[in-house]
Amino acid sequence: MKTFALILADGQASRMGGEDKGLALLGGKALIDHVIDRVRPQVSHIAISTNRNLEEYARRSPHIFPDARQWQHFGPLSALCTAANDLQLATADWLLVVPCDMPYLPDDLVARFETVSKRTPLCNAYYVETPITMHYNIMYIRPQILQSAIPYLFSGMKTLRSWLQQQRARPVRFEFDGHFADLNTQTDLQEG
């Protein structure tokens, strides 16, 4: 089974003072590098969605793309709508979508998603659930469903949660919430 990763690094990072969150340092290393180190052993290809510092991100993966102009400023859905037209991503069996600000993702993230997907073969989308919350921005999806994000966004809807509900996505339970800590502020980075 061929699984690709799409790392979302295209947010405005308003809680980070506008600093490019993916390039913010945690322990002397960029957040996105922590995420790449966690997902690289689990996938066969990594793409990065980013709207700035394209050259810097290209050092990490040759497969980078900014949000298409018509989708900019709609959050993670912008990246999904743009990815819907990416021919290379379309060749994957599954697409792991993760944000660039979660440096502690579990080493068995894809394996857990794969196990559940084999038990529920008619389901095309999954997301992370922990004892504390749902993490809709961590998805395991069939690339074919990305096309549905376009009319969803055109309809005025903007949340990942509602889009995933439309896809009849199922949660996959992870017991340790710490793996999914997102570092959104400079204080988070200092405490991280």
UniProtKB/Swiss-Prot annotation:
* Requisite cofactors: Mg(2+)
What is this protein's gene name? Answer: mobA
Domain of life, per UniProt, equals: Bacteria
Catalysis: reaction(s): Mo-molybdopterin + GTP + H(+) = Mo-molybdopterin guanine dinucleotide + diphosphate
A single Gene Ontology CC term = cytoplasm
Can you tell me which family this protein belongs to? Answer: Belongs to the MobA family.
Q: For binding Mg(2+), which residues are annotated in this chain's numbering?
A: D101
Described by its record, this protein's role is as follows:
Transfers a GMP moiety from GTP to Mo-molybdopterin (Mo-MPT) cofactor (Moco or molybdenum cofactor) to form Mo-molybdopterin guanine dinucleotide (Mo-MGD) cofactor.
Q: Any idea of its EC number?
A: 2.7.7.77
Keywords from UniProt, A to Z, are: Cytoplasm, GTP-binding, Magnesium, Metal-binding, Molybdenum cofactor biosynthesis, Nucleotide-binding, Transferase
The entry lists its GO molecular-function terms as: GTP binding; metal ion binding; molybdenum cofactor guanylyltransferase activity
Q: Does the keyword Metal-binding apply?
A: yes
Q: Name one GO biological process term.
A: bis(molybdopterin guanine dinucleotide)molybdenum biosynthetic process
Q: What is its quaternary makeup?
A: Monomer.
Q: What is known of its domains?
A: The N-terminal domain determines nucleotide recognition and specific binding, while the C-terminal domain determines the specific binding to the target protein.
Record's protein name = Molybdenum cofactor guanylyltransferase
Enzyme class per UniProt: transferase
